[in-house]
């Protein structure tokens, strides 16, 4: 979806200039497995789970069409992390009973939001990617939402706006099969249900696999390589650092780069209570 939109916008970008602002969110009601809830095993909470995706796609769409994935230079990161729903005693107990993870002792964030600022090295133009992620989206299921704003043009995506919808009444609800076959993290089995007709393509798996195979066949590195993944990880850690210190993290500072190299967030150390409560 995003890749196709960028290809369609290429002629517009050539005439008007690249996107200046990207806003991305990925939200659902919480992970399936206990280890994903445990910050000491997963490395954090929703920021390290899904914030990495939102930061990555923001960087991608802000990059001028035809440029490498790391063309834009990350300049700064500003973020906050919070424990909202799953910090309430009632829901902490539910999580402990269901997953065996005690957020009274080792909590992780269930909400994060932030801004990454990038600079175009050719024009010095600054552009921004805003990200928002949560583990408390209890609507229909997993939602991916994004929009991009450029001079004179824009795009918008919402994965729950499906061309296919199903309605299941109360009498038929007991006969409904596993609703996750229709939508990941589905939270309902009756009413008006959204159906994602091609999740593998929506989440980028098809493009990534095709690029990996094509790259391997000609002996070149993939479009999204190890160094790119390491940079996304660094941006996530900078977001945790920003939330902990309550200030913008400037990635152009040498001391900051040195600190990030061995940085481990308090949340990932099991000390989230120091910053979330």
Task: Give residue spans per PLM region.
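C-terminal hydrophobic helical "lid"/dimerization subdomain
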Residues: 11-14, 232-241
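Rossmann-like dinucleotide-binding domain that binds NAD(P)(H)
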Residues: 32-141, 227
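A contiguous active-site-proximal alpha/beta segment in oxidoreductase catalytic domains
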Residues: 1-33, 54-55
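C-terminal glycine/acidic-rich active-site capping loop/insertion
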Residues: 84-124, 144-227, 231, 249, ...
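Short, hydrophobic/amphipathic alpha-helical packing segments
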Residues: 51-55, 209, 233-236
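Short, hydrophobic alpha-helical segments
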Residues: 6, 62, 66, 209-220, ...
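Alpha/beta-hydrolase-fold catalytic nucleophile elbow
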Residues: 23-25, 80, 149
């Amino acid at each position: 979806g995003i890749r196709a939109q960028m290809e369609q916008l290429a002629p517009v970008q050539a005439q008007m200039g690249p996107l200046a602002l990207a806003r991305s969110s990925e939200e659902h009601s919480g992970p399936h497995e206990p280890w994903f809830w445990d910050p000491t095993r997963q490395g954090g909470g929703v920021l390290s789970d899904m914030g990495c995706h939102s930061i990555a796609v923001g960087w991608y769409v802000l990059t001028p069409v035809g440029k490498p994935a790391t063309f834009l230079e990350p300049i700064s990161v500003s973020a906050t992390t919070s424990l909202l729903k799953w910090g309430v005693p009632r829901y902490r107990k539910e999580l402990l009973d269901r997953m065996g993870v005690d957020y009274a002792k080792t909590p992780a964030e269930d909400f994060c939001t932030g801004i990454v600022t990038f600079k175009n090295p050719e024009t010095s133009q600054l552009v921004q990617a805003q990200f928002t992620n949560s583990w408390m989206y209890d609507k229909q299921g997993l939602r991916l939402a994004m929009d991009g704003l450029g001079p004179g043009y824009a795009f918008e995506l919402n994965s729950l706006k499906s061309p296919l919808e199903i309605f299941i009444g109360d009498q038929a609800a007991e006969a409904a099969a596993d609703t996750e076959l229709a939508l990941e993290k589905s939270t309902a089995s009756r009413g008006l249900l959204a159906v994602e007709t091609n999740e593998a393509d929506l989440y980028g798996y098809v493009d990534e696999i095709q690029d990996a195979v094509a790259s391997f066949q000609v002996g070149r590195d993939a479009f999204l390589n190890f160094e790119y993944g390491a940079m996304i990880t660094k941006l996530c850690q900078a977001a945790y650092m920003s939330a902990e210190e309550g200030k913008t993290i400037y990635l152009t500072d040498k001391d900051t780069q040195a600190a990030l190299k061995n940085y481990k967030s308090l949340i990932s150390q099991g000390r989230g209570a120091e910053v979330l409560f």
